[in-house]
Amino acid sequence: MQTLTQHLTSQAVNDSLSHLILTLADTSKAISHAVRHGALAGVLGATEQENVQGETQKKLDIITNDMLKDALKADGTVRGLASEEEDHVVEVRQNGQYLVCFDPLDGSSNIDINSLVGTIFSILPAPAGELTETSFLQSGRAQLAAGYVLYGPSTMLALTTGQGVQLFTLDPETNEFLLTNAAMSISPETQEFAINMSNQRFWEAPMQTYIADLLLGKIGPREKSFNMRWIAAMVGDVHRVLSRGGIFTYPSDNKDPKKPYKLRLMYEANPMAFLVEQAGGKASTGYETILDITPTHIHQRVAVILGSANEVDACLSYHGIDSHK
């Protein structure tokens, strides 16, 4: 099996980008160790702090954020970083080539119940000149690489550099990421969907109708039965989609009119959309393709519908969108 280093060389990824990807991968090994030692190390539970989104921070949110910040500051290629846990962008070094956006511990509310969590990252080119928040406001099409690390029964890294999606598994004996799937591919058809049904009464009418038709199964207009899955961690739900197809959606809702969207564009939706498109799937807000959005701020939120291409198209048709035009 190829190691991650060997794979990056075989794909002719340039040295500086390879170095940065390896830094992120190495840090994820340390995060995996911290996650597995959670209760034993006394790092489970919440703090009294909130992040910029107003969410209570878990102890491991802060620990993993600091681990990534420290590693990226030492990497030598990074111009600046943006994190879910940081109010503002962080300048790293003036001659850095890359910007890194990340969610250090996606699904951290799962940590206290020993369920799936992960790290999501996006790498962008650093524009010339002074580093400001505007430097980061590039569409998802500008991403040079993106991926996630899933901390589950095994630790897995899904990665794209624009040449398909590869899956690596951390070998606990050698502490190396080994290539275990050279070409992840999302089947266009599916009978699985993932959504937080507790928000159903708050969704827009198109999404309510779409899900209602899925639940009707064979006796409804879709004429086939669907199964629902929900892990409550985007990294886990998207991993399932990449592994066996499906549609994942976190639509807009009016539960809190000031916060109609849940997922962040820069370090959740964009990297996942890049992975999904590279694996043959589609990713949309319901009204526009995620990777085509020009961000307005680093913590911008969006609706997300992604996964098997034909099922995403079906969902979009309920929103009055003809994806074939």
Swiss-Prot record:
EC number: 3.1.3.11
Record GO biological process: fructose 1,6-bisphosphate metabolic process; fructose 6-phosphate metabolic process; fructose metabolic process; gluconeogenesis; sucrose biosynthetic process
Keyword set, alphabetical order: Carbohydrate metabolism, Cytoplasm, Hydrolase, Magnesium, Metal-binding
Compartments, record wording: Cytoplasm
Binding residues for Mg(2+) 2: D103, D106, E268
Pfam families: FBPase, FBPase_C
Coiled coil: none
Transmembrane segments: none
Superkingdom assignment: Bacteria
PANTHER family: FRUCTOSE-1,6-BISPHOSPHATASE-RELATED, SEDOHEPTULOSE-1,7-BISPHOSPHATASE, CHLOROPLASTIC
Family to which the UniProt record says this protein belongs: Belongs to the FBPase class 1 family.
Annotated protein name in UniProt: Fructose-1,6-bisphosphatase class 1
